[in-house]
Amino acid sequence: MVSSISITLILSLIPLSTESAPSDYVGRQRCIECHSGEHRLWATSHHASAMLQPGEKLATAKFDGATVNAGGVLSRFFFENGSPQVEVTDRSGQKTLPVKYFFGIEPCQQILIEQPNGRLQSYPVAWSTGTGERKKGWYSLFPGEETPPGDPLHWTGSLNNWNHMCAECHSTGVVKNFNAQKNIFETRYEEIDVSCEACHGPGSSHVEWAVRPKEMEPGSNSERLS
């Protein structure tokens, strides 16, 4: 007679399910091969414009020398050598900061400034596209508030850090890669905007299924599998 202990041991060695390997990101260009119609609809969506680079058509902010004075900071928006810049004058002096990305599409477009140690920071003055209640132009996101450097709410602080606070929702396949010992970010992403796999998940397994010969599908004529 087989003991209950032996049966338990045998059952523990039998896999209850077959787990597939985790999927990898393939990028939307691979998705377009079969889903061009969906891609055309996506291309006009806010997801497609969640992050914009300078020079893109939908990045409509004007860098024509306009200024905003708020919270003890004077901000001037202008072009230098063909690139958008923000001249910041505050209690620490004056500095010029290049714009790395535009963040969002409407009713406002915020700007991201590249800072040391791999950080991207959201600047507290945004561009209103004029599609909401506010007229078109630059405006302070925190009017009347003066936040000193070192405060987490300052634009260089942790609460305005793109890597930690924003990236996972505005880009696809984000890995923050924060090194606490060195206090640096080595953030990477698969695609800069909210692309197909941000919502549907990594697509390599789906692609493998889609290109698999139909005779390999369950229920197919087994004679064709010889």
Task: Kindly give the residue locations of the regions a language model identified.
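Mature N-terminal segment immediately following signal peptide/propeptide cleavage
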Residues: A21-E56
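Generic structural "secondary-structure junction" signal
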Residues: G27, Q53, G65, W127, ...
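Short, structured protein-protein interaction patches enriched in aromatics and acidic/basic residues
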Residues: L58-F77
